């Protein structure tokens, strides 16, 4: 999404990870460090799961707060859908972000306490006053510039005009949280 916080600031506020086998297929295709086990620590660092933060596959101290509706909070239509799915043989799935789960149940949402916990709120707001961070409106990253394997800069387009360049002095991925692998592949070519 073209908003501060990217796609995490849009749509239905669903905070759902990909299937472990999808990440594992990336690693098997040669993307070292992208297996589910490799990424799990980052998933955990990213979240404060208000329902399952005590589980080994969830976090309890990350910047993005996640929750699920309790069954008693579901509206009539949701309860009917849940009952129909269970009657059709689908397993109860209280945590869709748990490894190897399928079934029907409430989705994890990033809207705890009535706030949409986007990457802008969870990551950028606490860092806005840092001298090494610049947030620019109407700016799109077109390419990540490398010196060997180290990202050193960004080629950007501002207000639809290409050609700007920004120097990277901090470590870490200069990509949004959503669509990152695909974006990294496109930007690093």
Label the model's feature ranges.
Residues 11, 15, 65-67, 94, ...:
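Structural recognition of the beta-strand scaffold that forms the well-ordered cores
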Residues 9, 92, 162-163:
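Short, isolated positions in well-ordered beta-strands
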Residues 42, 144, 154-189:
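Glycine-rich loop(s) and the adjacent beta-strand/alpha-helix scaffold that form part
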Residues 7, 13, 52-55, 146, ...:
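Short, solvent-exposed loop/turn and secondary-structure capping segments
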Residues 5, 20-21, 59-62, 183:
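Surface-exposed beta-strand-to-loop junctions
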Residues 1-44, 155, 189:
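N-terminal glycine-rich phosphate/pyrophosphate-binding loop and immediately adjacent elements
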Residues 27-151, 157:
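Conserved redox-cofactor binding core of oxidoreductases
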